[in-house]
């Protein structure tokens, strides 16, 4: 496909990037911390960590992993925590030790955590105490040999940290009891690491940096193998796209999205490290009043988020009173930005929400609206520099502009494949092209618009939910005979999970089924709607027709609206 979109690029956005500007993420990091040493890198709960402190602490943590635990280059280390100052210390410590980061959603259930730890073969995990009870239930069934435990306030000043840890544990009671007698404290790891020798590993661009887990049509999470080059390429692509709006050493980005999510990991953490910017880490973005209080303290210049976050902020009266004069970049992704939200955002802040599109397998950015756009296009924008894109029909033939087809992409940001899953890799990457499973339309200028999903994936607040996983869990309930899970529109989260159930036990209730799911699934995957049926529609070979149920369910929602 001819790259028609290049003609629509702003004049100062390059058509190609250099993915080999750095040898590794470690090289990028070390150059940035030297250049911006005394500037703030991260702030959380009022505590500032400079680039110099980040360098010192991450070096100590890397040394501890190497010398204290005896881990080697290529070992996998899981990271399970929300946005805290400990996160970047551990993240860059793992990378600087030549090891592979395995990000874990801290809200995972024991079942989900056990699968990810076993699949990745993680030999160590860094976890915040609030979620240690989950790990306790499964750690003996995994290959994890080392548990490094931290508390919410452990990277704050002594007085403040003591207060935070006391309040979190004893007042708010956010730390369920756990028993991990062999765990090492994060503080001890750093203390010991400062006295150990750090040995910088020899890294090449093709070395793995992350195993970033994503769902699959099989319902089993798979690890996308993202190399240092993949991440650096996407970093340069984001920088090329947004760069004209950003000023090195002078930015403060609001990081309300969790850093364990690929969107915030690349665009907030890594990009602003390279630019010498400051990340304002929001630990609990669901506390909108608390988030707004934090925003009022800082002249933030950039913010990233999903539609639900922007909508919640717009509906907060205190947010409406903030000073937006410093803001010059608002980036939305993870889920479609609704037009009404985009229009309200520009009216309040004076800045357009630049919607983009990406997926874990692409580190993540594939396309974004140009920074000079002065309207809400409703599209996912133009392919980013050094990216090829095409739309194909079911026979893999390219379709002309204006016709729907599956979006396929090729570029330096595309993953190596799925960890230990060559079968799944071959299904998604064919002849060098990654098949996204999303059905899109491209207009004459190259703007892409997603019109449907080839896969049955459900998108809840920017998180992928796969029907097979939900169905597998529901079918474990003894009162269920059959089930089908679909996504239906939801004003609060974009989509919500709805299940259609055929009872085996006539006394089965919606409440008991949802309670059962809550024990097995993290919050955003739990069905919000349950409908009991005498039977489910099936094809002539007996396959449940999810699409028919989804269309019917969406029709009901539309009619109610």
Swiss-Prot record:
Homodimer. This is Long-chain-fatty-acid--CoA ligase. Post-translationally cleaved by OmpT. PROSITE patterns: AMP_BINDING (PS00455). Catalyzes the esterification, concomitant with transport, of exogenous long-chain fatty acids into metabolically active CoA thioesters for subsequent degradation or incorporation into phospholipids. Activity is the highest with fatty acid substrates of > 10 carbon atoms. Is involved in the aerobic beta-oxidative degradation of fatty acids, which allows aerobic growth of E.coli on fatty acids as a sole carbon and energy source. It holds the Pfam family AMP-binding. Its cofactor is Mg(2+). Induction: Well expressed during log and stationary phase aerobic growth but only poorly expressed during anaerobic growth (at protein level); aerobic expression is suppressed by glucose or C8 fatty acids. GO terms for molecular function: ATP binding; decanoate-CoA ligase activity; fatty acid binding; long-chain fatty acid-CoA ligase activity; oleic acid binding; protein homodimerization activity. It catalyses: a long-chain fatty acid + ATP + CoA = a long-chain fatty acyl-CoA + AMP + diphosphate; hexadecanoate + ATP + CoA = hexadecanoyl-CoA + AMP + diphosphate; dodecanoate + ATP + CoA = dodecanoyl-CoA + AMP + diphosphate; (9Z)-octadecenoate + ATP + CoA = (9Z)-octadecenoyl-CoA + AMP + diphosphate. Changing residue 222 to A: Decreases activity. Belongs to the ATP-dependent AMP-binding enzyme family. It is found in: Cell membrane. The gene is fadD. Keywords: ATP-binding, Cell membrane, Fatty acid metabolism, Ligase, Lipid metabolism, Magnesium, Membrane, Nucleotide-binding. Pathway: Lipid metabolism; fatty acid beta-oxidation. The enzymatic mechanism is a two-step reaction that proceeds via the intermediate formation of an acyl-adenylate (acyl-AMP) intermediate. It is a peripheral membrane protein. GO terms for cellular component: cytoplasm; cytoplasmic side of plasma membrane; cytosol. Its EC number is 6.2.1.3.
């Amino acid at each position: 496909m001819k790259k028609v979109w290049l003609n629509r690029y702003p004049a100062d956005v390059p058509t190609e990037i250099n993915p080999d500007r750095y040898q590794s993420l470690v090289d990028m990091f070390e150059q940035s911390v030297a250049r911006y040493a005394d500037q703030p890198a991260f702030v959380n709960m009022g505590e500032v960590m400079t680039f110099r402190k980040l360098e010192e602490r991450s070096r100590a943590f890397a040394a501890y992993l190497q010398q204290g635990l005896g881990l080697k280059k290529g070992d996998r280390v899981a990271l399970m925590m929300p946005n805290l100052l400990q996160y970047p210390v551990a993240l860059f410590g793992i990378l600087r030790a030549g090891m592979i980061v395995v990000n874990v959603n801290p809200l995972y259930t024991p079942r989900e955590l056990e699968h990810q730890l076993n699949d990745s073969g993680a030999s160590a995990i860094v976890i915040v105490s609030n979620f240690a009870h989950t790990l306790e239930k499964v750690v003996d069934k995994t290959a994890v040999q080392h548990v490094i435990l931290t508390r919410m306030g452990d990277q704050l000043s002594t007085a403040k940290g003591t207060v935070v840890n006391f309040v979190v544990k004893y007042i708010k009671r956010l730390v369920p009891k756990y028993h991990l007698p062999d765990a090492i404290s994060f503080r001890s790891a750093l203390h010991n690491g400062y006295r150990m020798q750090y040995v910088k590993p020899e890294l090449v661009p093709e070395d793995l940096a992350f195993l970033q887990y994503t769902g699959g049509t099989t319902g089993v999470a798979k690890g996308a193998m993202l190399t240092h080059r993949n991440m650096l390429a996407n970093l340069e692509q984001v920088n090329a796209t947004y760069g004209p709006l950003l000023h090195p050493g002078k930015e403060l980005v609001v990081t309300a999205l969790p850093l364990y999510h690929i969107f915030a990991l690349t665009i907030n953490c890594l990009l602003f490290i390279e630019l010498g910017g400051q990340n304002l880490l929001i630990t609990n973005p669901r506390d909108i009043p608390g988030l707004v209080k934090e925003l009022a303290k800082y002249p933030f210049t950039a913010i990233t988020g999903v539609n639900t976050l922007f909508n919640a902020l717009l509906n907060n009266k205190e947010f409406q009173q903030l000073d937006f004069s410093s803001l010059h970049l608002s980036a939305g992704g993870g889920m479609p930005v609704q037009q009404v939200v985009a229009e309200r955002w520009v009216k309040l802040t004076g800045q357009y929400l630049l919607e983009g599109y990406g997926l874990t397998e692409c580190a993540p950015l594939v396309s974004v609206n140009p920074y000079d756009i002065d309207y809400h296009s409703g599209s996912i924008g133009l392919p980013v520099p050094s990216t090829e894109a095409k739309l194909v029909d079911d026979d893999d033939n390219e379709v002309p502009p204006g016709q729907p087809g599956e979006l396929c992409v090729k570029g330096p940001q595309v993953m190596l494949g799925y960890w230990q899953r060559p079968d799944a890799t071959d299904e998604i990457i064919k002849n060098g092209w990654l098949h996204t499973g999303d059905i899109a339309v491209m207009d004459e200028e190259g703007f892409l618009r997603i019109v449907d999903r080839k896969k049955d994936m459900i998108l809840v607040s920017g998180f992928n939910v796969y029907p097979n996983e939900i169905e597998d869990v529901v079918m474990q309930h003894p009162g269920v005979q059959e089930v089908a899970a679909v996504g239906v529109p939801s004003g609060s989260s974009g989509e919500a999970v709805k299940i259609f159930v055929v009872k085996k036990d006539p006394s089965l209730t919606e409440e008991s089924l949802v309670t059962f799911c809550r024990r097995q699934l993290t919050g955003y995957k739990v069905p919000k709607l349950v409908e009991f049926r005498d039977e489910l529609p099936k094809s002539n070979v007996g396959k449940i027709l999810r699409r028919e149920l989804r269309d019917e369910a969406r029709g009901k929602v539309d009619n109610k609206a």
